[in-house]
Regions:
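PIN/NYN-family metal-dependent endoribonuclease catalytic core
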Residues: 7, 22-52
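Short, well-structured alpha-helical segments
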Residues: 60-71
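Metal-dependent nucleic-acid phosphoesterase active-site entry motif
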Residues: 1-20
Length: 139
């Protein structure tokens, strides 16, 4: 089974910094075509900008490799402007892409900052998404 998901930047960063973690499992599933990442150019730009912050000590080559891998497996989705207030305005695109994708797919938004988004059953933490996938595979 394939799962469609917008992956918040904090999940990607956590995975890169600690591969043997729940966020690392999420990205591993994305790189192995179990989770289909949903992106647009703004999301990809955010990934790059954050991963290249000096505090993460990642080279441009490493970041490019990560993003190339993500893009190779991702579906590009145009966001649709929604009238929703979020604590962090940069989170808006992740929510908007998720909502647009949900018009045709059972898409999720995977985030470590669940409190920054409206309470919806399709907005999940990395652990919740992993549990959903594991439960489905046991059925």
């Amino acid at each position: 089974m394939k799962y469609y998901a917008v992956i918040d930047t904090n999940v990607l960063v956590s995975a890169v910094l600690k591969w043997n973690s729940v966020p690392g499992n999420i990205i591993d599933l994305a790189f192995n075509d179990v989770i289909i990442p949903l992106v647009n150019q703004e999301i990809l730009n955010e990934y790059k900008t954050v991963l290249l912050r000096p505090k993460f000590h990642l080279t441009e080559l490493i970041v490019t490799d990560i993003l190339d891998e993500m893009k190779a497996r991702a579906i590009d989705v145009s966001e649709e402007h929604l009238d929703v207030e979020l604590p962090d305005p940069k989170d808006r695109v992740f929510y908007e892409v998720t909502m647009k994708a949900r018009e045709s797919e059972d898409a999720h938004l995977i985030t470590g900052n669940i409190k920054h988004f409206p309470t919806k059953p399709f907005i999940v933490t990395p652990r919740q998404m992993l549990d959903l996938i594991l439960e489905s595979s046991n059925e």
